[in-house]
């Protein structure tokens, strides 16, 4: 890690407003050269090479336990054709719908999902293109949020708002919160709006 005082921070990343900064820490982490979709595709390709059967545009209609196997009814979402397969293991990766599927499958757990909405904003690139630094700040609630370079854009975020329904949307409050946080921490020619 490298430690920077405010003066050095201003020199290495001039977009940061250093008027109230005491310093910064720079450390190396990983950088995903492609986007997350390419990363997932690479993961799926590795699974295929290891012998996995994979399918796209397939919906799980039902799953039930029979002995030491899962019997899964699937539907091709393009053709509507249904078919059955078996598996030793089923990974419930349904995100906010995990509890709903567990109930449908008769699976009980000690844990329940707590819904949280996280939104990012995508804006024109805010940092220099010379370095692909991810900037991390503490927001007014002391949560970390980031400015992540992505080509000619920057991704700012995310929020973390507790919600009761997984079907949610971005609100003006979400946008206003992130814009206020980033405008207070960067020295931009014009505030982001």
What do these predicted regions represent?
Residues 64-90:
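Conserved beta-strand-loop-beta-strand element in the redox core of flavoprotein oxidoreductases
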Residues 84-85, 92-193:
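Active-site substrate-recognition segment that forms the wall
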Residues 48, 57, 77-79, 115, ...:
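Residues that act as N-cap/strand-start positions at coil-to-secondary-structure junctions
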Residues 52, 90-92:
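Conserved catalytic-core segments centered on acid/base and nucleophilic motifs
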Residues 1-45, 49-50, 55, 63-68, ...:
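Flavin (FAD/FMN) cofactor-binding and adjacent substrate-gating region
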């Amino acid at each position: 890690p490298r430690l920077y005082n405010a003066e050095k921070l201003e020199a290495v990343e001039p977009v940061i407003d250093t008027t109230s900064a005491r310093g910064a820490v720079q450390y190396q982490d990983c950088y995903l050269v492609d986007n997350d979709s390419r990363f997932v595709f690479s993961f799926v390709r590795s699974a295929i090479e290891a012998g996995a059967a994979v399918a796209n545009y397939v919906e799980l209609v039902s799953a039930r336990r029979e002995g030491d196997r899962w019997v899964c009814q699937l539907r091709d979402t393009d053709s509507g054709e249904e078919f059955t397969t078996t598996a030793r293991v089923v990974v419930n990766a349904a995100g906010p719908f995990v509890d709903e599927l567990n109930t449908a499958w008769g699976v009980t757990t000690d844990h329940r999902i707590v819904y949280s909405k996280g939104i990012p904003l995508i804006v024109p690139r805010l940092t220099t293109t010379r370095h692909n630094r991810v900037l991390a700040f503490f927001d007014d609630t002391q949560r970390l949020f980031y400015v992540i370079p992505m080509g000619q854009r920057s991704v700012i975020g995310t929020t973390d708002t507790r919600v009761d329904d997984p079907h949610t949307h971005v609100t003006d409050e979400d946008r206003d919160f992130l814009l206020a946080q980033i405008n207070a921490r960067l020295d931009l020619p014009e505030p982001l709006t």
